[in-house]
UniProtKB/Swiss-Prot annotation:
This is Movement protein. GO terms for biological process: transport of virus in host, cell to cell. The keyword Transport applies. GO terms for cellular component: host cell plasmodesma. Residues 245-273 are annotated as: Disordered.
Length: 309
């Protein structure tokens, strides 16, 4: 009888559509809420090029913090047995405009085999313009643990699965992407070989901030009313004309709560905050936050903050 790994998790049942169902499930929200406490967001700079992330079990925050610092000799990583990595799910978010050229490559590697090459079928390459995305990588074997150390870049580590990420084709110098890896991993005394699961990459729809756009539209109305109530001329003979870029065909006319004041030659417009009915809500993993402000210091009132998952 052949031994084949079976999983009841959402991720490995009907892999072609399980990611979508998992992303919308209560289980995912609970997983992300729990995992987010570990500060798992990893930033990848285009100038740095590459970033390795060692996949270790997360037993507690202190344990994870020590492990991510490669302090493997504290007894947190056994030297005997096997590392069993069931799956690794990585969310990738861009910090560049959608039109930006460039791509990101994410790979699952085993330093005991090669520190430069990915495991077969464990590599995904996607354009920065295709982000955000969710990527799943699954190995088909368990890794034996030992005391001997291997060199990974400028650090030493014992043989462990790790993620390798590289941004290329982007000429900027800042942070190009952020990663949020979530994985299921444990150590055990038995080992096995598993049916190969190919890498999966699923696109995530960008958030439509329609309610935010409504706030911007209302701010335009406030600004328009403020401009129309200004004097028709100022020193120098310049006249205020009706702003041509503002829509005048709104079904709802908001009262002007703006005031103006002059400080020397500078003229400022103070815009009142909208009422409660104008506040917008961004639904994202059920997370609520504090007030949100728009650019130029114009506050639009309290609302929920948007968090990625």
């Amino acid at each position: 009888m052949s031994l084949i790994r079976r999983s009841t998790s959402h991720q490995l049942n009907a892999l072609d559509n399980s990611l979508q169902s998992y992303l919308g499930s209560q289980e995912f929200k609970e997983d992300m809420r729990e995992q987010a406490g570990f500060g798992r967001w990893k930033r990848v700079k285009a100038s740095a090029g590459e970033k390795p992330i060692v996949l270790v079990p997360d037993n507690s925050y202190s344990a994870l913090k020590a492990l991510m610092k490669s302090e493997y000799e504290k007894g947190l990583i056994p030297s005997k047995g096997y590392m069993h990595l069931k799956w690794c799910l990585v969310f990738i978010v861009a910090h560049v405009p959608k039109e930006t050229m460039g791509e990101v490559c994410i790979e699952l590697r085993d330093p005991g085999i090669s520190t430069a090459d990915p495991l077969p079928g464990c590599q995904v390459v996607c354009a920065l313009s295709d982000l955000p995305r969710a990527v799943m990588l699954v190995p088909d074997y368990d890794m034996p643990l030992g005391k001997s150390k291997l060199r990974l870049g400028n650090q030493e580590m014992r043989r462990m699965f790790f993620l390798h990420t590289k941004v290329s084709g982007f000429t900027g110098q800042g942070v190009a992407i952020s990663l949020f890896p979530v994985w299921d991993c444990d150590f055990r005394g038995t080992c096995n070989n598993y049916v190969k699961v190919p890498a999966v990459s699923v696109g995530i729809d960008r958030t439509e901030r329609t309610s935010l756009l409504n706030c911007v539209k209302q701010l335009k109305q406030y600004a328009e009313n403020a401009l129309l109530t200004m004097p028709q001329s100022i020193s120098g003979g310049t006249s205020f004309a009706r702003p041509s870029h503002l829509s005048l065909n709104e079904s709802k006319t908001l009262p002007s709560t703006s005031t103006t004041e002059a400080e020397g030659s500078e003229r400022r417009i103070h815009i009142g905050a909208p009422s409660n009915e104008d506040l917008y809500e961004v639904k994202s993993a059920g997370t609520t936050g504090g007030p949100v402000s728009l650019v130029n210091g114009v506050s639009v009132g309290a609302s929920t903050q948007s968090a990625f998952f």
